[in-house]
Amino acid sequence: CMKAAPMKEVSVRGQGSLVYPGLRTQGNLETLSGPNDATRGLTSLADTFEHVIEELLDEQQVIQPSKENKDADLYSSRVMLSSQVPLEPPLLFLLEEYKNYLDAANMSMRVRRHSDPARRGELSVCDSTSEWVTAAEKKTAVDMSGATVTVLEKVPVPKGQLKQYFYETKCSSKGYAKEGCRGIDKRYWNSQCRTTQSYVRALTMDNKKRVGWRFIRIDTSC
């Protein structure tokens, strides 16, 4: 069950023209990467990537949430404010997915890499696609009270305006979306892949022209 945070102006922090709403960070590149990274001599790009990911996850565990950011877990990594279309999935989204995978696997890094589903030829039950969607494409959404609100395309910031982007995941129009879930015996069971939604925080306007940050529903999984 999700608990709504108080409706207050969300902080925007980041570098350049790419930021996450409500993202709070601690430390800098030196403290996150560690003093001995340059001399460790990792042998491959895969090892380097895994090493950086693990250090970021370790740093995240060290940071203890204070009373001021007790609602930080309600902020979604699927919302981004940017002057242009993001070229990659959100970093926090990748970290969360990777952390969930590590927790589930609970094995050494090298064993995890060789047991990756892609290496074993495993397929998901339902095929899905993910992409960045603009507020102009969404136009409207449903908030936590069930009311339809207008999703604002641009968010004012000290140096101008940034566009709102949403990283949505939905069932693929091809494959097993209509034929049923992969791996289910169709002779005995009926199944269907459906797109499910979650709440993210976005700048919106209600039917009374009141602008504010609200939790709205977007497509997040299949």
Swiss-Prot record:
Residues 5-113 form a propeptide. Disulfide bonds join C126-C193, C171-C222. GO terms for cellular component: axon; dendrite; extracellular space; synaptic vesicle. Residues 1-4 form the signal peptide. The keyword rRNA-binding does not apply. It is found in: Secreted. One of its GO terms (biological process) is modulation of chemical synaptic transmission. PROSITE patterns: NGF_1, NGF_2. GO terms for molecular function: growth factor activity; nerve growth factor receptor binding. It comes from the Eukaryota. Keywords: Cleavage on pair of basic residues, Disulfide bond, Glycoprotein, Growth factor, Secreted, Signal. Glycans are attached at N106. Gene3D superfamilies: Cystine-knot cytokines. It holds the Pfam family NGF. Belongs to the NGF-beta family. Promotes the survival of neuronal populations that are all located either in the central nervous system or directly connected to it. This is Neurotrophic factor BDNF precursor form. It comes from Xenopeltis unicolor. The gene is BDNF.
